[in-house]
């Protein structure tokens, strides 16, 4: 019986050794199987990380473009507002210029009696006040006679030959031109020397 017991113990020991060997082999196989799985998972995580970084960079670039667009919009709006303020009176001044021309023509009359002289003096005073008010608003008359012809400031309606003037010089002003600050409201209508 002792021999049987010894055999049983040996069998149990062998079974235990076999089980341990199988367990060790299974663990090794699992570890080997896990290693590629871990590598695959690492590669997958790295790929996801790279994609997320690219998306983040894309979003940051988009945000920078939106911010730049917004800054440009604010700058344009500010410039438009400044221009609107600077030239706010342009329309009414443009409408007043023909009346001013007629007023200046009326001042050209030759007074034949004392009453007409008095009226002319009053009109000259009003004319000076109108010109002063326009000057305060930033309106200036465009210089013409004797100046070089500038297509931005002058409108040539005739060409003449006059030795007293240089070539391409304005000889005569037919209608006054005006600027509002740096913008031409109406160009001077002129005769130009050839």
Curated annotation (Swiss-Prot):
Q: Name one Pfam family in it.
A: GrpE
GO BP annotations, alphabetical order: protein folding
Q: Which residues cross the membrane?
A: none
Listed under GO cellular component are: cytoplasm
Under PROSITE patterns, the record lists: GRPE (PS01071)
What are the UniProt keywords, alphabetically?
Chaperone, Cytoplasm, Stress response
| MF annotations from Gene Ontology | adenyl-nucleotide exchange factor activity; protein homodimerization activity; protein-folding chaperone binding; unfolded protein binding
Its function, per the record, reads: Participates actively in the response to hyperosmotic and heat shock by preventing the aggregation of stress-denatured proteins, in association with DnaK and GrpE. It is the nucleotide exchange factor for DnaK and may function as a thermosensor. Unfolded proteins bind initially to DnaJ; upon interaction with the DnaJ-bound protein, DnaK hydrolyzes its bound ATP, resulting in the formation of a stable complex. GrpE releases ADP from DnaK; ATP binding to DnaK triggers the release of the substrate protein, thus completing the reaction cycle.
Assembly description: Homodimer.
This chain's protein is named Protein GrpE
Lineage, please? Answer: Bacteria, Bacillati, Bacillota, Bacilli, Bacillales
